[in-house]
Regions:
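Substrate-recognition element of Asp-dependent hydrolases with the DxDx(T/V) motif
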Residues: 26, 93-123
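Metal-dependent phosphoesterase signature
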Residues: 56-95, 103
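Asp-based, Mg2+/Mn2+-dependent phosphohydrolase catalytic module
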Residues: 1-5, 41, 101, 115, ...
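Conserved hydrophobic/aromatic "anchor" residues
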Residues: 9-11, 75, 149
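Short beta->alpha linker loops
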Residues: 46, 50, 88-92, 113, ...
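Helix-loop "lid/cap" segments that line or gate small-molecule binding pockets
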Residues: 29-30, 50-64, 121, 152-153
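Active-site neighborhood of HAD-like aspartate-dependent phosphohydrolases
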Residues: 1-45, 56
């Protein structure tokens, strides 16, 4: 595996296994607004384009449902208070990030999760290894637009040359392409090998240590 100078990571399904807390908040919001719950696998399929899109997919009828805004607001409020209930780093992630920092690499998170939750999770799990964490904000286009990744590079003070984006989804592959940087696709997240290949993955790893398996 080529060694880069800057490693920018997706959050959900890449650094953290967040699916059970996301599903719990989705279903709390659906129950609170009189709608049927979703299965864990359904929520897994809905994740990847930010929490508004997650709820749009979870709510029957999406944005056209008159209860959508209430369900969306309930989800956000519930998730802010329950995002740490079962969420944890995937095995090997903390060791990977520590080794990257030991080698003097720059490390950032860029997620489509809303900004407050992204910041909270980064502070809680990776206070000494992640330098910049950017989530969805109204003033900047979310992935797959390049804007949030470019903003992370600006805050780190680095150029695109020598940077790589690491994620578990088609959105991450497209984001890296739009930034003109390589993408490492991971198999421990929310999408499988065939799905990633169909969506253009060119470098796929099954364990975090493979990202630094060779100098």
């Amino acid at each position: 595996m080529k060694e880069y100078q800057t490693y920018i990571f997706d959050l959900d399904g890449t650094l953290l296994n967040t699916i059970r807390d996301l599903a719990a908040s989705v279903n709390y919001a659906l129950r609170s607004t009189g709608m049927a719950e979703r299965t864990l696998e359904e929520v897994r399929e809905f994740v990847g384009n930010g929490v508004k899109k997650l709820m749009e997919r979870a709510v029957p009828g999406g944005l056209d449902n008159p209860q959508f805004e209430a369900a969306y607001a309930t989800f956000r409020q519930h998730y802010l208070h329950h995002s740490l209930d079962t969420t944890a780093p995937y095995p090997g992630i903390e060791k990977l990030l520590s080794e990257l920092r030991r080698r003097g690499k720059r490390v950032a998170i860029v997620s489509n999760k809303f900004y407050a939750a992204t910041q909270e999770l980064a502070r809680h799990f990776f206070p000494d290894t992640v330098e910049v964490a950017i989530g969805e904000r109204e003033d900047i286009r979310k992935k797959p637009a390049p804007d949030t990744v470019l903003e992370a590079m600006r805050q780190l003070g680095v150029e695109a040359e020598g940077a790589v984006y690491i994620g578990d989804s088609d959105v991450d592959i497209e984001t890296a392409r739009n930034c003109s940087i390589p993408c490492i696709s991971v198999l421990w997240g929310f999408r499988d090998h065939d799905f990633l290949l169909r969506h253009g993955a060119t470098c796929v790893v099954s364990r975090p240590e493979e990202i630094l398996s060779e100098e």
